[in-house]
Amino acid sequence: MTTHDTPLKGRICLVAGATRGAGRAIAVQLGTAGATVYVTGRTTRGEPSEVGRTTETIEETAELVTAAGGEGIAVPTDHLEPERVRALVDREHGRLDVLVNDLWGGEHLIGSAFGRKSWELDLADGLRMLELGVRTHAVTSHLAVPLLIRNPGGLLVEVTDGTAAYNGTRFRENLYYDLAKNAPIRMAFGLAKELAEYGGTAVAVTPGWLRSEQMLASFGVTEENWRDALGKAPDFGISESPVYVGRAVAALAADPDRHRWTGRSLSSGHLAAEYGFTDADGSRPDCWGFLVAKETGTPAVADHR
């Protein structure tokens, strides 16, 4: 491989929340670009997290990063525990070039919550969503950013659900989920202001309708036959594989002019149009454009892929 093939060779990345889904794909794509990638999560081969899935582990993610051409290093970490995050940061070669906050793991809390008023929900579950989706990001940034700013050009990516434009005028069906997914957008905006004097860049990035392992399981399909779900959910045709957002973050990390995006809320579809990459199947889904168009008409999925 040439340096053109591995533009991130020699870079140190941390993907916090990389057990599965978007986080795993981001880590693998950073590895494909040649980076050393620390991957964290709570599910290990010896112990599952509260998510309750044992089919994906943080060790497996690290192995996938290495197989892709990078160096994957698994560090089991609960990002609600500051001391464990501090120990993680202390391991990172004395430098950090890319920090990706993809911390969540609250899907098991939202299944019965959508469509219900906030006061009808279990308060402990609602507050747990905020712990998992907001506090984890705050703890990790607080402890990792001092390492990120040691060298100019650091990149911080807050992964969330929805763009600022979309979420800003739409309620995400559940108050606690809405708060958990809008907070990272504001974190990216605020951190962009704070990182500016150090030459750092902070952005929020969202996938579209993500064909994560859990989403595929909910439809009873796999990545190979996901279109079988279109009979009961035609709009699932606008969905995207995790590879798409992984390529989006890798493209940002490799862009020497990435600071032009700082403080902004970006989507995988937007970045695909900018950088010219595609999803794994060669398509370029634009989920958020499709959803906006659907509010005023009946758009064809094919027009947004």
Spans of model-derived segments:
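C-terminal helical subdomain
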Residues: 204, 224-305
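Catalytic loop of short-chain dehydrogenase/reductase
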Residues: 105-109, 117-123, 149, 153-197, ...
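A short, exposed helix-loop element centered on a Lys and neighboring polar residues
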Residues: 141-142, 189
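Canonical Rossmann dinucleotide-binding motif of NAD(H)/NADP(H)-dependent dehydrogenases/reductases
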Residues: 5-44
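Active-site-adjacent segment of SDR/Rossmann-fold oxidoreductases
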Residues: 33, 190-200, 256-259
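The beta1-alpha1 cofactor-binding region of Rossmann-like NAD(H)/NADP(H)-dependent oxidoreductases
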Residues: 55-56, 76-88, 123
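Active-site loop of short-chain dehydrogenase/reductase
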Residues: 11, 70-71, 95-96, 148-162, ...
